[in-house]
Regions:
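Anionic-ligand binding patches
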Residues: 2-9, 15-220
Length: 220
C-alpha cells in the first residue's frame, strides 16, 4: 500500500471521533489535521453501506486538501431493529429526523433537537430504546458497532478496512466516557458500557480499533 507521508487529514467534524482517531494514529508519528482546521465541508453521505460513506468522505477531503485523508463511517446496528439505525446512526440524533419504519410513537417533529439545534445523542439513545421496547421482549437486545475506515490519496487511490464489535444494549445509559451511543452498549465479555470503561480499554477492543489495526498492518 502507498505511504501516507508526514501529514494526514482526518475527515471528521466530530470532536470525539477526532480525538480517538488521533490517539490511535499516535504511534505512527504522523501530523493529523482535523477537517474543521482546514475548513473542509462535510459531504453529504449518500452511500448505502458504511464503506460507501467512508470512501466518499475520504475522497472528498483528499481532493480538497491535496493531502492523504482518512475517514471513518461508523454506527450502531440493532438486531431487533433489523440493523437500524446502521448507516443512519448519526441522523437519528439530528433535530426533526423522522425514524423510518418506527414502531413507537415518534414524538414531536423537533424531537432530537437540543437548544443549539445540533445532534443530541441522549435523545437518539432514547429513540433506539423505544424502538427496541416496541419490538417486544422476544426480539432481545443484541447489537453491534461497525467501523469502516477509508484512506484516500489525492490521485484517487483509496483503501478501506472494516471492524466490528458485538454486544448488548442496556437502559438507562451509563458512563460519561466515549461519545455517541457508547453509554448504552456493553461489549461481549464486559460488564461496563463503552461509556464507563477506560478509553484505553475501549481502544483495545472497539470496532474502530479493529479497523485501525488492519490499516496499520497494511501500511507495514
Amino acid at each position: 500500500m502507498k505511504s501516507i507521508g508526514p501529514k494526514l487529514v482526518i475527515a471528521t467534524h466530530n470532536e470525539g471521533k477526532l480525538r480517538e482517531m488521533r490517539e490511535l494514529l499516535a504511534p505512527l508519528g504522523i501530523e493529523c489535521l482535523g477537517a474543521a482546521e482546514l475548513d473542509l465541508p462535510e459531504p453529504e453521505e449518500t452511500g448505502v453501506t458504511f464503506v460507501d460513506n467512508s470512501e466518499l468522505k475520504a475522497r472528498a477531503s483528499a481532493d480538497l486538501s491535496g493531502l492523504p485523508a482518512l475517514a471513518d463511517d461508523s454506527g450502531l446496528s440493532v438486531d431487533a431493529l433489523h440493523g437500524r439505525p446502521g448507516i443512519r446512526s448519526a441522523r437519528w440524533a439530528e433535530p426533526g429526523y423522522k425514524v423510518p419504519g418506527a414502531q413507537s410513537a415518534s414524538g414531536s417533529p423537533a424531537e432530537g433537537e437540543d437548544e443549539a439545534g445540533t445532534r443530541d445523542f441522549g435523545r437518539a439513545m432514547e429513540r433506539v430504546w423505544r424502538e427496541v421496547e416496541a419490538a417486544g421482549a422476544d426480539a432481545g437486545h443484541d447489537a453491534h458497532f461497525t467501523c469502516a475506515l477509508s484512506l484516500a490519496w489525492p490521485d484517487g487511490t483509496v483503501e478501506s478496512f472494516e471492524g466490528k464489535v458485538h454486544g448488548t444494549l442496556v437502559w438507562p445509559p451509563r458512563g460519561q466516557n466515549g461519545f455517541g451511543y457508547d453509554p448504552m452498549f456493553v461489549a461481549l465479555g464486559f460488564d461496563e458500557t463503552f461509556g464507563e470503561i477506560e478509553p484505553s480499554a475501549k481502544r483495545a477492543i472497539s470496532h474502530r480499533a479493529q479497523a485501525f489495526r488492519k490499516l496499520v498492518a497494511a501500511l507495514g
